[in-house]
Swiss-Prot record:
Entry annotated with the keyword Signal: yes
Chain positions carrying an annotated carbohydrate: 160, 193, 216
Native organism taxonomy: Eukaryota, Metazoa, Chordata, Craniata, Vertebrata
Any GO molecular function: transcription corepressor activity
SUPFAM superfamilies, A to Z: FMN-binding split barrel
Family: Belongs to the CREG family.
Gene: CREG1
Known function: May contribute to the transcriptional control of cell growth and differentiation. Antagonizes transcriptional activation and cellular transformation by the adenovirus E1A protein. The transcriptional control activity of cell growth requires interaction with IGF2R.
Name the UniProt record assigns to this protein: Protein CREG1
Length: 220
C-alpha cells in the first residue's frame, strides 16, 4: 500500500508539473511590445484596420502596431560591400494608442547595420501585419498584399537631446527589456527620417504616400 501511495503521489506530481509547463508554453510572452507589454492581439485588442482606400492612414496604422521591422542598409562588410543588407530591429513610434508615426530605434555600434549607417545613412524599413494575428486570422499569406505591409525609406540618424525623452519613452514602454541591456554596448536612440512611403494592402501594386500625407493623419 505504501508503494502504491508513493506511486500515486509521483503520478499526481508529474501531472501537475506537466500542466504548469503547458501553461507556460502557451501563455503569451510578456515584455515583447504592444499593449500591456504583451501582444497587440491578446484578447482581440488589435485596433481595426483602417479603410484600404485611405493609404496614409493604413501606413500610420501599420507603423504604430509594429514592434519590429526589417531595416535594409548598404553593407560596408568587405565580403558583401555595396550589397543590400537587411536586419530585424525592434522599434516603436510611441505608446499604444499615441503613435507619432516616427519609427524610433535603440541601437549599438556593435550592430552590423549601425556600421553600415555610419558610412551611408540611407535605409529602407519594412513592417508587416504578419507580425500580428491579423493575417493568420484571415488566412492571408505573409507575401499576400492583403497581409498589409509598408516600406518607409529615408535616413537613420541619432535623435537630438530635445527628442531623447520621447524616443526613450516610446521604446521602453513597448520594449521594457531594453532597460536591462548591457550599457557596455553604448546604446543610443535613433529614428528614421522618412522621405518615401509605399503601402501594399491590396492587389494591383503599391500605393505611394507622401510624408506630408502620412504625418497629417490624426491617430485615434
Amino acid at each position: 500500500m505504501a508503494g502504491l501511495s508513493r506511486g500515486s503521489a509521483r503520478a499526481l506530481l508529474a501531472a501537475l508539473l506537466a500542466s504548469t509547463l503547458l501553461a507556460l508554453l502557451v501563455s503569451p510572452a510578456r515584455g515583447r511590445g504592444g499593449r500591456d507589454h504583451g501582444d497587440w492581439d491578446e484578447a482581440s485588442r488589435l485596433p481595426p484596420l483602417p479603410p484600404r482606400e485611405d493609404a496614409a492612414r493604413v501606413a500610420r496604422f501599420v507603423t504604430h502596431v509594429s514592434d519590429w521591422g526589417a531595416l535594409a542598409t548598404i553593407s560596408t562588410l568587405e565580403a558583401v560591400r555595396g550589397r543590400p543588407f537587411a536586419d530585424v530591429l525592434s522599434l516603436s513610434d510611441g505608446p499604444p494608442g499615441a503613435g507619432s508615426g516616427v519609427p524610433y530605434f535603440y541601437l549599438s555600434p556593435l550592430q552590423l547595420s549601425v556600421s553600415n549607417l555610419q558610412e551611408n545613412p540611407y535605409a529602407t524599413l519594412t513592417m508587416t501585419l504578419a507580425q500580428t494575428n491579423f493575417c493568420k486570422k484571415h488566412g492571408f499569406d505573409p507575401q499576400s498584399p492583403l497581409c498589409v505591409h509598408i516600406m518607409l525609406s529615408g535616413t537613420v540618424t541619432k535623435v537630438n537631446e530635445t527628442e531623447m525623452d520621447i524616443a526613450k519613452h516610446s521604446l521602453f514602454i513597448r520594449h521594457p527589456e531594453m532597460k536591462t541591456w548591457p550599457s557596455s554596448h553604448n546604446w543610443f536612440f535613433a529614428k528614421l527620417n522618412i522621405t518615401n512611403i509605399w503601402v501594399l494592402d491590396y492587389f494591383g501594386g503599391p500605393k505611394i504616400v507622401t510624408p506630408e500625407e502620412y504625418y497629417n493623419v490624426t491617430v485615434q
